[in-house]
Amino acid sequence: MLRYHMQGFSGYGVQYSPFFDNRLAVAAGSNFGLVGNGKLFILEIDRSGRIVEVNSFLTQDCLFDLAWNESHENQVLVAQGDGTLRLFDTTFKEFPIAIFKEHEREVFSCNWNLVNRQNFLSSSWDGSIKIWSPLRKQSLMTLTPRPLEITKMVDPLNAIILKKKSFTGISKNRNCVYQAQFSPHDQNLVLSCSGNSYASLFDIRLPSGKNQNNFLVHSGLEALTCDFNKYRPYVVATGGVDNAIRIWDIRMLNKNESATIKRTVPGQLHNSSCINEIPNAHGLAIRKVTWSPHHSNILMSASYDMTCRIWRDLSNDGAKETYKTNSTDATKGSIFNFTQHSEFVFGADWSLWGKPGYVASTAWDGNLFVWNGLG
């Protein structure tokens, strides 16, 4: 295990370089990201196994996420709390080479298109997703998940929990798009998750009125994270405030979102596209889920309970569907539990390089850890 401490800053996002096996970027904020500066750290693992800072950029607001430019080895994009995205060249000092500003609230996520490598997207508290080109300051397209009421398709008995005071923040954040991602298989597909507990799947080739499917993913509680499986184009995972990880088959989504939820037992809801579930995967909300780049049935999660976990998706054995669920397994499919962080874990990423299983994680404790989750 390797460690790097970002003195005075809390980690929000981390990503390995797609070009260099020893380089990482970390997005961070001072004062837990609540107020004050942000900082982009460019780190390298040297030959002696130490993590060293090779460059950094101080920003005027917290950084919530980042993405390496898939077509330029020295460029990193960051999502900033003032509603802007900033593109930095790691060979320069101090200033970004481009600023993109259209969002009206904090930008919570950014993601580079892995297929065409020419576009990137952003998602924001303002309820929108924007698609950009690094060659122009204006966005190419704005996507807005349909405004869906939290209880629209939830049975009133099951929605009682929403009336508890501890969940009053959900109504305030219902339009916040916490994360959005391009599909690694199709440059035209975008997946997002929002505070209204819905995930949205967009096909940007279609007209705006017909380009999305919305499906309830976390029982009326905020959906905080989502990811496409790297090998199974039709499989996605989500995580949220209900402490659960759910795995979905997007081929089973109905075109009309009102039909995606079907009653099977009075007072209960069933979504036909949910193919697996890890209930109570963590003790607190799940902030990040990400599929392995080396295995089709392994994923990682990071949580407010200060841990990262590696899971095996028991519904697939790596070659075919097994029709099993993690919820019926004694270990829930858990492979490894990383417990070295002492604060909320926000960011985690798999290494593309070397022996499969190496990951990096960062948290509010200001630490970046590099560790092996597969032994």
From Swiss-Prot:
Keyword annotations from UniProtKB, A to Z: Cytoplasm, Peroxisome, Protein transport, Repeat, Transport, WD repeat
Q: Which GO terms describe its biological process?
A: protein import into peroxisome matrix; protein import into peroxisome matrix, docking
Q: Which Gene3D superfamilies match?
A: YVTN repeat-like/Quinoprotein amine dehydrogenase
One Gene Ontology term, aspect cellular component:
peroxisomal membrane
Which compartments does it reside in?
Answer: Cytoplasm, Cytosol; Peroxisome matrix
Q: What is the effect of changing residue 106 to H?
A: Abolished ability to mediate peroxisomal import of proteins containing a C-terminal PTS2-type peroxisomal targeting signal
What InterPro entries does its record include?
G-protein_beta_WD-40_rep, PEX7, WD40/YVTN_repeat-like_dom_sf, WD40_repeat_CS, WD40_repeat_dom_sf, WD40_rpt
Q: Pfam families from the xrefs?
A: WD40
Q: Which GO terms describe its molecular function?
A: peroxisome matrix targeting signal-2 binding
Mutating residue 61 to R leads to what result? Answer: Abolished ability to mediate peroxisomal import of proteins containing a C-terminal PTS2-type peroxisomal targeting signal
- Start and end residues of the WD repeats are 58-89, 102-133, 172-203, 218-249, 281-312, 340-372
What SMART domains has UniProt attached to this entry? WD40
PANTHER family according to UniProt:
PEROXISOMAL TARGETING SIGNAL 2 RECEPTOR
What is known about its subunit structure? Interacts with PEX21.
- Miscellaneous remark of the record: Present with 589 molecules/cell in log phase SD medium.
Task performed by this protein: Receptor required for the peroxisomal import of proteins containing a C-terminal PTS2-type peroxisomal targeting signal, such as 3-oxoacyl-CoA thiolase. Specifically binds to cargo proteins containing a PTS2 peroxisomal targeting signal in the cytosol. Cargo protein-binding triggers interaction with PEX21 and formation of a ternary complex composed of PEX21 and PEX7 along with PTS2-containing cargo proteins, which is tranlocated into peroxisomes by passing through the PEX13-PEX14 docking complex.
What protein family is recorded? Belongs to the WD repeat peroxin-7 family.
| Name under which the protein is recorded | Peroxisomal targeting signal 2 receptor
Annotated organism of origin: Saccharomyces cerevisiae (strain ATCC 204508 / S288c) (Baker's yeast)
Q: Which gene encodes it?
A: PEX7
